[in-house]
């Protein structure tokens, strides 16, 4: 199986210290991408909440694009599955980023079949695992849901 780096809940826009809710920040996120690639990951899954729902500025949208542009330079495949915070934004992601549908679907990442669905609305009430696509024989099957979805 081709190694996959999976990240979630980066919450770009949050301060890195001094607030009740903090985030790791862009420098950490870019370093995490570099470290994943250095460790041999060939694919990236960003499993939701790349940006914070409340704590963001216009510059944060540039940070989101910088994150994904850097990911595209490092990985063969970049898959973004939206999280509950992402639903509050109209993200215009760089060409080459695959954005997961809110309906359960399968995306091939090398020799791995990734079954996922993006969050549709904040506080998404759906239970999706039962409607996930069937396993694909002869490959590794990986199911990914953002933490705000249940199955």
PLM features: residue spans?
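N-terminal active-site segment of His-dependent metallophosphoesterases
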Residues: 1-63
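His/Asp/Glu-rich metal-coordinating catalytic cores
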Residues: 43, 54-151
């Amino acid at each position: 199986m081709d190694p996959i780096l999976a990240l979630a809940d980066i919450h770009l826009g949050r301060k890195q210290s001094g607030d009740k809710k903090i985030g790791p920040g862009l420098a950490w996120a870019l370093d995490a991408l570099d470290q994943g690639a250095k460790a041999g990951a060939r694919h990236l899954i960003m499993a939701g909440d790349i940006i914070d729902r409340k704590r963001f500025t216009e510059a944060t949208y540039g940070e989101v694009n910088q994150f994904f542009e850097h990911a595209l330079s490092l990985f063969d495949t970049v898959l973004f599955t939206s999280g509950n915070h992402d639903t509050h934004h109209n993200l215009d992601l760089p060409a080459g980023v695959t954005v997961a549908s809110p309906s359960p679907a399968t995306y091939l990442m090398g020799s791995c079949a990734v079954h996922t669905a993006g969050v549709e609305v904040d506080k998404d009430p759906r239970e999706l695992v039962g409607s996930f696509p069937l396993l694909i024989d002869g490959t590794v099957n990986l199911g990914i849901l953002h933490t705000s979805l249940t199955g």
